[in-house]
C-alpha cells in the first residue's frame, strides 16, 4: 500500500493494524504513552496525534488506506503534544533521580525530547498510595492513567487484579477495595511493570541484602538463569554476546562471590525428573494433563483460579528451587558446612521468582532473587566494564548444562527438554507439530514403545482458560505466564516489547548452538548427582518435589461466632458464601455451635464464619484448621476434629 508521509511516498504493508504501527515499521516513531500492540487500542494519552487532510486525529485508532496523506510534525501538533506533556507533568511526582525508571522512563524521555524545562500549569495535589507489600511495588504518584497495566493484566494475563477507580481528577488505578497487592490474586508476573511507561510500577530492589552478605563471613553462591544472559547486554548497548554468561561469572567472582552455578543445570535436573514423572502418569492414566510447574506466576494463578487442577501440576520444583535445594542440602554437606553458612543468590528474569523463593514450602533455600535489571545495576555500581571482562566458566559440578536445558529460557523450552529426555530414555518414533492457533502450539508425539500423547505450549495466562475449555485431549501442557517465555519476564531490561523478546529468543538459540551437550541425559554431572546423592525415591522426593495449595482471590474476612482469644485451640471456619449457604452450610454451622456449647468446648474449639474459599464446585465447604473439607457435613467435620485431639 502506498501512502504519503510529510510529503514523501512510503510503502507499507496492506494488513497493518493502524497507522501508528505502519509508520513504526518503516522507521517513523510517533510518540505515544498508552499504546500496546498486544492489547486493545485505548487512545487515552493523545500523544500520537497526526494530521490527515487537515484533520488532527490519533494514529493508534486510524486504519491506513491507499493514498493517505499524513503529516506527523506540524507546528500545531508539536504544540499540542507539549501541552499534553506539561499537563501530565503538572500532577506527576517529578523526583526522577530517585525513581526506578530514571533513564528508561518514556515520560522523562519525551519531556527531554520536547525541551520542557518548566511547567506552566499549577500543580494540583491528590492523595497517593505506595504499596510495597509485594515484589511488585505500586506508586500512584507516578501513574499517568495510561491504562497499560490494566489492559495487560486483564486482556493478556486474564487476571484483572487492577482497574480504574473513582472519576475525573480523582481517578486512580488500584486493586479492589485498595487491598494490598500481596493479598490479592495478583500472580506477580511483572508484565504490568514491563509495560508501564513510568515508575508507577516497579520491582522491589534487594541489592542491599546482597551487599550485606558479601561483607559477612558467609559463603556467597550465585546462580544465573538462561534468559538473563540473553537480555542483560541490552543494558550496555551490546547487540549479542554468546559469552555473556561467562563474563557474568567473572564479574560476580570479582565482587566477592565464592561460586557461580548455572540454573540451566537445574533445568536439566527438572526436565529429567519431570519426564519420568510424566511417563509414569501417562502409563497409569493418572492426573492428566500434567502441567509444568517451572513458572511461579502460573503456579500462583493455578492456586487462585484452578484449584481443581493442582493435583495435575508437576510436583517437581522449578529449576531455581531444585538447584537451590541441591546446593543447600547436598553441596553444603560436601563442603562440610551447615546450610545456613551459604547465602544463595538467584539471578532471574522474573519478578514472581522473588515470591517463589519466599513461599513457606521453600523457606531457607534461596536467600534472595535479583532480576536482570538489578544485576545490571550491580554491574554499573561496580564501575566495571562488562565488555572488557575476561570470561570464566561456571563452577563445577553444577555449571555444566545441555542445549535443551538452556532452552528453558524461551517458550516451549520445558516441553522440548522433557521430550529430549523421553527420546533418550524410551525413543521417539514421530513428532507432528501442528500449526499454532492463537499463539498455542500443539504436538502429537509417538514413542517407540507404542505410547502416544499430545502436548501443548501456552504463553500468556489469558489463553489458559479457553484452551482448557476447548481441549480435553492433551496429556502434557507447558504454561508460561509471559509472552515468549522467560525472555519476556517482568524483570528484564526496558523496553520489553514483542520485538525485543523475539530478539532475545534468537540470542538464546544462538547461545544454545555452542553447547556440546544436546540433552540432560548426556550431562555426566547430572547423572553423577543421581548416582551418588539422589539414588532412592524418598531422597528424590524430599529434594526435588514440592506441594501446592488453593489460595483465596480475596482477603480473608472472618466473622467471629464462638471466638477463642488465646491458648491452644482447634479452628473451624464455615463458608457462608452464596453457593455454600444454599447447599447447607448454615445448618452445619448451627449444629456445630450447639455441639461445642453442649460439650463445654467453647475454650477449645473456635468457630468462625468465612466467605468464599475458592472451592464452590464442592460446596458446602468447611475449613478445619488448615484443611478444606469439600462436600462437608456435620459428621465429616466432627470426624476431622477427632483427628489429632
Curated annotation (Swiss-Prot):
It catalyses: 2 H2 + 2 oxidized [2Fe-2S]-[ferredoxin] + NAD(+) = 2 reduced [2Fe-2S]-[ferredoxin] + NADH + 3 H(+). It comes from the Bacteria. PROSITE patterns: 2FE2S_FER_2, 4FE4S_FER_1, 4FE4S_FER_2, 4FE4S_HC3, COMPLEX1_75K_1. May bind 2 [2Fe-2S] clusters per subunit. May bind 4 [4Fe-4S] clusters per subunit. GO terms for biological process: ATP synthesis coupled electron transport. GO terms for cellular component: cytoplasm; membrane. [4Fe-4S] cluster 2 binds at residues 143, 146, 149, 196. Catalyzes the oxidation of the physiological electron carriers NADH and reduced ferredoxin, coupled to the production of H(2). Acts as a bifurcating [FeFe] hydrogenase, which uses the exergonic oxidation of reduced ferredoxin to drive the unfavorable oxidation of NADH to produce H(2). The alpha subunit contains the catalytic H-cluster. This is Bifurcating [FeFe] hydrogenase alpha subunit. It comes from Thermotoga maritima (strain ATCC 43589 / DSM 3109 / JCM 10099 / NBRC 100826 / MSB8). The gene is hydA.
Amino acid at each position: 500500500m502506498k501512502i504519503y508521509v510529510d510529503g514523501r511516498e512510503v510503502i507499507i504493508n496492506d494488513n497493518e493494524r493502524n497507522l501508528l504501527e505502519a509508520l513504526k515499521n518503516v522507521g517513523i516513531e510517533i510518540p505515544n504513552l498508552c499504546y500496546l500492540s498486544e492489547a486493545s487500542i485505548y487512545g487515552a494519552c493523545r500523544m500520537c496525534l497526526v494530521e490527515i487532510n487537515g484533520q488532527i486525529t490519533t494514529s493508534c485508532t486510524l486504519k491506513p488506506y491507499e493514498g493517505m496523506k499524513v503529516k506527523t510534525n506540524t507546528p500545531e501538533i508539536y504544540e499540542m503534544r507539549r501541552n499534553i506533556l506539561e499537563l501530565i507533568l503538572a500532577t506527576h511526582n517529578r523526583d526522577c533521580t530517585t525513581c526506578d525508571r530514571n533513564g528508561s522512563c518514556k515520560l522523562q524521555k519525551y519531556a527531554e525530547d520536547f525541551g520542557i524545562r518548566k511547567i506552566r500549569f499549577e500543580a494540583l495535589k491528590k492523595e497517593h498510595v505506595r504499596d510495597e507489600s509485594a515484589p511488585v511495588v505500586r506508586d500512584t504518584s507516578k501513574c499517568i492513567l495510561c491504562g497499560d497495566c490494566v489492559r495487560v493484566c486483564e486482556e493478556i494475563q486474564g487476571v484483572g487484579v487492577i482497574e480504574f477507580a473513582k472519576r475525573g481528577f480523582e481517578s486512580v488505578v488500584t486493586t479492589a477495595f485498595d487491598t494490598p497487592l500481596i493479598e490479592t490474586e495478583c500472580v506477580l508476573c511483572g508484565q504490568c511493570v514491563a509495560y508501564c511507561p513510568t515508575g508507577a510500577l516497579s520491582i522491589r530492589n534487594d541489592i542491599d541484602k546482597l551487599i550485606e552478605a558479601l561483607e559477612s563471613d558467609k559463603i556467597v553462591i550465585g546462580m544465573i538463569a538462561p534468559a538473563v544472559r540473553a537480555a542483560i547486554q541490552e543494558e550496555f548497548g551490546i547487540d549479542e554476546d554468546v559469552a555473556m554468561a561467562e563474563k557474568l561469572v567473572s564479574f560476580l567472582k570479582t565482587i566477592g562471590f565464592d561460586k557461580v552455578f548455572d540454573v540451566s543445570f537445574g533445568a536439566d535436573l527438572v526436565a529429567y525428573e519431570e519426564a519420568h514423572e510424566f511417563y509414569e502418569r501417562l502409563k497409569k492414566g493418572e492426573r492428566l494433563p500434567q502441567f509444568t510447574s517451572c513458572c511461579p506466576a502460573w503456579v500462583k494463578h493455578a492456586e487462585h483460579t484452578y484449584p481443581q487442577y493442582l493435583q495435575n501440576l508437576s510436583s517437581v520444583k522449578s529449576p531455581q528451587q531444585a538447584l537451590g535445594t541441591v546446593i543447600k542440602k547436598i553441596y553444603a554437606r560436601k563442603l562440610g558446612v551447615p546450610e545456613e553458612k551459604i547465602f544463595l543468590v538467584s539471578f532471574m528474569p522474573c519478578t514472581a521468582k522473588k515470591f517463589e523463593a519466599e513461599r513457606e514450602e521453600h523457606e531457607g533455600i534461596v536467600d534472595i532473587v535479583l532480576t536482570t535489571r538489578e544485576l545490571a545495576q550491580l554491574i554499573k555500581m561496580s564501575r566495571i566494564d562488562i565488555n572488557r571482562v575476561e570470561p570464566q566458566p561456571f563452577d563445577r559440578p553444577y555449571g555444566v548444562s545441555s542445549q535443551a536445558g538452556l532452552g528453558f529460557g524461551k517458550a516451549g523450552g520445558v516441553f522440548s527438554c522433557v521430550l529430549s529426555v523421553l527420546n533418550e530414555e524410551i525413543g521417539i518414533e514421530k513428532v507432528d507439530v501442528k500449526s499454532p492457533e492463537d499463539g498455542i502450539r500443539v504436538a502429537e508425539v509417538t514413542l517407540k514403545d507404542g505410547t502416544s500423547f499430545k502436548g501443548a505450549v501456552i504463553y500468556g495466562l489469558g489463553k489458559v482458560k479457553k484452551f482448557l475449555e476447548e481441549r480435553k485431549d492433551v496429556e502434557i501442557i507447558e504454561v508460561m505466564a509471559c509472552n515468549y517465555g522467560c525472555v519476556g519476564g517482568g524483570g528484564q531490561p526496558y523496553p520489553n516489547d514483542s520485538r525485543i523478546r523475539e530478539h532475545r529468543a534468537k540470542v538464546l538459540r544462538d547461545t544454545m548452538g555452542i553447547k556440546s551437550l544436546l540433552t540432560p541425559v548426556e550431562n555426566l554431572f547430572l547423572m553423577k548427582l543421581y548416582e551418588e546423592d539422589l539414588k532412592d525415591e524418598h531422597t528424590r522426593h524430599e529434594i526435588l518435589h514440592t506441594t501446592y495449595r488453593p489460595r483465596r482471590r480475596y482477603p480473608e474476612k472472618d466473622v467471629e461466632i464462638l471466638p477463642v482469644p488465646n491458648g491452644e485451640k482447634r479452628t473451624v471456619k464455615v463458608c457462608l458464601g452464596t453457593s455454600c449457604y444454599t447447599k447447607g452450610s448454615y445448618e452445619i454451622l448451627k449444629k456445630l455451635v450447639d455441639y461445642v456449647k453442649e460439650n463445654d468446648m467453647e475454650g477449645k474449639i473456635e468457630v468462625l464464619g468465612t466467605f468464599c474459599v475458592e472451592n464452590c464446585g464442592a460446596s458446602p465447604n468447611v475449613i478445619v484448621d488448615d484443611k478444606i473439607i469439600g462436600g462437608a457435613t456435620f459428621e465429616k467435620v466432627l470426624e476431622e476434629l477427632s483427628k489429632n485431639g
